[in-house]
């Protein structure tokens, strides 16, 4: 058996291409993402559940709601953890020139590494849903940022010093300059 310290999972559970492999139950396209998490958690390898964690990158675009987290609780086993990407409003120093940002496109992000916003809008749903025992590392993805390495590290250090210690955090830097 695999050590209990090791968790195997994937970056998402919502890959429809796994139907017939990981997923054996039929799912309507409209409800697939909401309903298949429980079956993902039950997937067996050598008569043992294989997946004990999964990522959720949809939370990069908006924080989860307490109701979403409660729906997950109804589908996951007691020892299962989910890793969530942190909302981009916290992790991007300026908005890319993309239509999805509307009037903010190309503008600085005044909420970059805003610990108060993170505590209020990102962490609160986890607490309200009592999801903390199932929360794996919260993943901060940083892409291009236009800051010097020293400035970025100083801002990051200041930010993390304001966060509660009862959650775990991870940083993914997608910037060749660092």
Functional labels for PLM-detected ranges:
Residues 1-178:
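Residues lining hydrophobic/aromatic ligand-binding pockets adjacent to catalytic sites
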């Amino acid at each position: 058996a695999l050590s209990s310290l090791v968790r195997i999972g994937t970056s998402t559970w919502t890959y429809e291409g796994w139907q017939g492999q990981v997923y054996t139950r039929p799912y309507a396209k409209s409800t697939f993402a909401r309903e298949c998490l429980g079956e993902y958690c039950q997937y067996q390898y050598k008569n043992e559940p294989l997946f004990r964690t999964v990522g959720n990158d949809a939370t990069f675009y908006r924080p989860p709601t307490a109701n979403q987290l409660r729906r997950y609780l109804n589908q996951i086993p007691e020892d299962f953890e989910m890793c969530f990407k942190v909302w981009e409003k916290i992790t991007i120093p300026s908005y890319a020139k993309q239509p999805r940002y509307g009037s903010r496109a190309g503008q600085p992000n005044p909420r970059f590494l805003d610990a108060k916003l993170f505590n209020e809008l990102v962490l609160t749903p986890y607490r309200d849903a009592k999801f903390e025992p199932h929360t794996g590392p919260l993943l901060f993805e940083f892409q291009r940022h236009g800051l010097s390495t020293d400035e970025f590290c100083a801002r990051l250090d200041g930010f993390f010093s304001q966060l509660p210690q009862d959650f775990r955090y991870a940083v993914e830097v997608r910037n060749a300059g660092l």
